[in-house]
Amino acid sequence: MFEVLVLKIEDPGCFWVIIKGCSHFLEQEVDYQKLNTAMNDFYNSMCQDVEMKPLMLEEGQVCVVYCQELKCWCRALIKSIISSADHYLAECFLVDFAKYIPVKSKNIRVAVESFMQLPYRAKKFRLYGTKPVTLHIDFCEDNAEIVPATKWDSAAIQYFQNLLRATTQVEAKLCAVEEDTFEVYLYATIKNEKVCVNDDLVAKNFAYYVSPMGNKNLNPLEKPRQSLNSVTCSSKLSPSLTLWPMLLQGKDYHRMENKALNYKDSLTDSPKMMLEKQQQSLPLKHTEKCTESSVYWPTKRGITIYADPDVPSVSGSSQRPNEKPLRLTEKKDCDEKNGCVKLLQFLNPDPLRADGTSDLHQLQKVKLGTLQPGVVLRNRIEPCLTLEKSPLSADLKKMALTCLNSDTEDMKVAMEEMIPPEALQRNKFPGPSHTASYSWPPIARGCDMVVISHCGNDPLLYLPPLLTILQMGGCYKSLPSRNGPLAVIVCPGWKKAQFIFELLGDYSMSSRPLHPVLLTIGLHKDEAKNMKLPRGCDVIVTTPHSLLRLLTYRSLLFLRLCHLVLDEVHMLFFEANEQMFAILDNFKKNVEVEERESAPHQIVAVGVHWNKHIDHLVREFMKDPCVVITALEEAALYGSVQQVVHLCLECEKTSTLLQVLDFVPSQAQKTLIFTCSVAETETVCKGSPAEQGDKKTKSVLLLTERNASHAVGILRYLERADAKIPSELYEFTAGVLEAKEDKKARRPLCPYLKAFGFCKDKRICPDRHHINPEMDIPRKLSNKTLPVFGHIRVIPFYISNATNYFGRIIDKHVDLYETLNAEMNEYFKESSNKTSAEKVENLGLYGLEEKTLFQRVQVLEVSQKEDTWGLGSILVKLIDEGRTKLITRDQLLLLPEKFHTLPPQAVEFIVCRVKPADSEIEWNPKVTRYIHHKIVGKMHDAKVVLALGNTLWIDPMVHVTKLSNLKTSIIDYNVRAEILSMGMGIDNSEHLEQLKKLYKEAKLPAFEDLPCQTSIPTTVEDTVCLQGTQQGDGGTERGAGSQEDSDNQKPGVLSEDIGSETISSAPQPHGRSFHPQIKWFQKDDVVILKIKIRNVKDYKCKFFTDRVIFSAWVGDKFYLADLELQGDIRKDDCKCIIKDDEPLITLAKEKQECWCGLLKQRNPNVAFDFDHWEECEEDSPFSKVVNSKNLSCKVAALAESSGSSSDTTDGSESE
């Protein structure tokens, strides 16, 4: 017996090893090192010598070649020669390293005799007395049996490879030598148990034994081999051979082929019969010491299904020391032989279910109803069924218990999929979940890992074992000593990243400091460029877009990275496919450098769904990954099971099934039919008792009208499976979705549809996605309803997110809330009126004292738990401000009926045309905090573009500051521009378009029919224009009208204080012209003018060096604009086009400079376009505030200045 090191495996009949330890076959390792050094010195010095190159090349020739991979000269055998245009290419086998490599003819040298004295270092081995078998299926006879084969099955080879890979020590006992091949009994030590590999292959039906005597049982094609110990072989046998007494007596080869391994008999016997037979032949005490072997039987694409990991398996793969060896001449009858064969079959009755679980145990588990959920594995994994046996550090095991006992709702939600409800109630941790028991061990060993499960969004599937690896600092010592993370966790959104970051903070108390960093980088280049990681940061939690932006400026970020974790991998590839593969390419490039060979490199992907991108991830970026799938419908996608669906009526289901089976080939094959009831089962059995299924795995689904509730889910599954979907299913599903949408008529409008104009998945969203005229009528604040258009003043009190606020509309004339508030304060001044509510009802209206104010509140929820003083917590909503608050019961005051009459004054406001960047659907808290600090409690001016129910859509929303000394006002900021300036939001031009569609579908007035189409009150723009003109020209102009005047203006009427005249937009005689309203903004080299008229006919535009004349007809109205420009333009490069049904003029500047205004003379119909304000502020991460002291010419906050009132407003006339 000697120890060996396996170099290369082709199959159990051909593998190369290095002999270790003391043996008369072994040369000293130092001799090979000296040989290697001498060969390199010699051939490097003689590399240009023509005499050293062989004159001709032949297959089987011994030579010396240069190996690019090993960077040295090696002894080799030429296996084949291929000719090409400029040289010959030889496939060579390196005899000392057991490698096949292609070598150019110029790198082949003659083998010097002195270098060929030492034997080849790689020895060729094969298993002694062991031959391959295969499963032969006779479709005509409808049976299957295991028969001898001429070559090893791929499943046997892969099992053999996995078995040796899992060993800690491999030993061999030499039995024979045939030419250059050593025939051995191979022993592998697995978990301190020694297993005879020869026996194990036979016991698992991967091989059969042949007689060691002469040539009697040899295949006629095989050559006889020389026995090293022919005398002892006749009397001493391997302990495993005691189970095969008749086969070792030289029985006829063909008889063994037909009867020795009768597969059908062994499978048709019941477990009880098999148990009785094996008890008659051999007592079970001989197998009590058997241990579970590392079993792996791959089926399609390497899938193995393990039905019950809880049942300890019994295997015949270990040695049986208590059994006595049998002589070759000893004769047994046929019953004893069959009993021994069936004993092996009982120990592992079905090689297609190679988990070692007996049918008897399976039946017992089914009867008890405790069958564990299935799991599909790519490699054999030993699950950790308890926390004590899990591969976690002791501190983390304690932390798992502590986290579970936490009362925080977030932790309970995170554990929801992992811990059974009864365990949560008992506050006891039962151990890792079913999925975690398979995912933790490979991750803790540093293996590449893919986990697909229904609970695949749970970070606890990978976080504890990952933290365990990060505690072992020794494996990272070879990495460069610079700042950079060891692990990066990529999440599909900032919200999940925030949760994992907080979870890391909790777990870091039980580990060495990892200094995790939450990385969310916006669109601004400077933010990524100036980002600096703190020293000692070992873990980064981020999103794909943020990480890629950082990599753009920090190319060495992955220099120390060893662990890349992809959380919710299916969502990552769905929402950021290009970014993910860019990150993976960068990671692969960094970990494959030679300096990183000794450091770990691991990719862990955890998700809910399998898709083609994950398949590409496994093939291109992972090395021998472990794949765990506990969602069996996802395993079908992984296994490429063909999905077919047929739609039919319930009454036609049986006939449709028979039609499907008619397309089955004439030779009967296996079909498994699932039915909904016993009656259907009997009908199907009578209708087609002998029909069988397709040879290729196929799933055929019959969908009837009774399965309408499953139609949407089935369609989504078939889409992910890339199946051929009949058009009828799309129509059927559309009808189902429409019916579901009708049922949601009383549900609130989808918040995402309101905020952004779209919902990510209407099929699963519980809210409504259409306008209900009954529910969405603008509600009344008093005797007036909410405004559906026009300009308003608002004060936001509660900031839900960056674009969603709750507040009040301020009416300058009659503020009913102020009156109510004054009356409530006066009432509650009397201490006798402050009566606490004894009985609290849900949705009841009460009073609440806050500092010096009294608020009306509505009870939303009353807590069932009471504190020590008997005061339970109550969740209330302040109906006049929109915010919610948690208070105690004694804070509620009885509210008189007279204070109930005024409807709630809180209104919901949504800022339009902006949405989160990076395909997010939730605003980053950084933006929400900034906007909250900016706008809460302040008066703002806004334009209403839509009103539904209690919600107003506003665009724009600005903060205005009055300059009383100058009798004018300026705009401090535009809320939408502020959001965009943070770099966390992008333009959402489709927002209003989607709202228009909703309006049309609900048959409500179209947007164009709404009376108000003006922008911010002209007086506000005029005051800003005046400020810009004063800044640019240094002159003094008259102030525009006050802001109060603008509140009174009606749609289509713009009031000016110049001469106190009011100019109407009523239709005028044909002989007169109208001046169109114009919005403008500028870039470095051009100025853009938007003419705010639609349905234009016969438009003309003439360009001069300092002037533009535009004219057009709209219906029976003639519009004319003669604009004298502030600066010069290149008239040949200017153009006028129709875009979005409106004229758009582009003026090319003569010089690339910033204009402080558009016109030399002020025109009230020409205003700066504040919607493009942010485009002038790209260079700054924050928007510039317009004020009276510092007005930038670049931002030009800047409508136009005017010296006279000769020009008129939109619709005004000129002679």
UniProtKB/Swiss-Prot annotation:
ATP binds at residues 453-460. It catalyses: ATP + H2O = ADP + phosphate + H(+). GO terms for cellular component: cytosol; PET complex. Residues 1073-1159 form the CS domain. GO terms for molecular function: ATP binding; ATP hydrolysis activity; nucleic acid binding; RNA helicase activity. GO terms for biological process: cell differentiation; fertilization; male meiotic nuclear division; piRNA processing; spermatogenesis; transposable element silencing by piRNA-mediated DNA methylation. Gene3D superfamilies: 2.30.30.140, 2.40.50.90, 2.60.40.790, P-loop containing nucleotide triphosphate hydrolases. It comes from the Eukaryota. Restricted to the gonads. It is an enzyme of class 3 (hydrolase). This is Putative ATP-dependent RNA helicase TDRD12. It comes from Mus musculus (Mouse). The gene is Tdrd12.
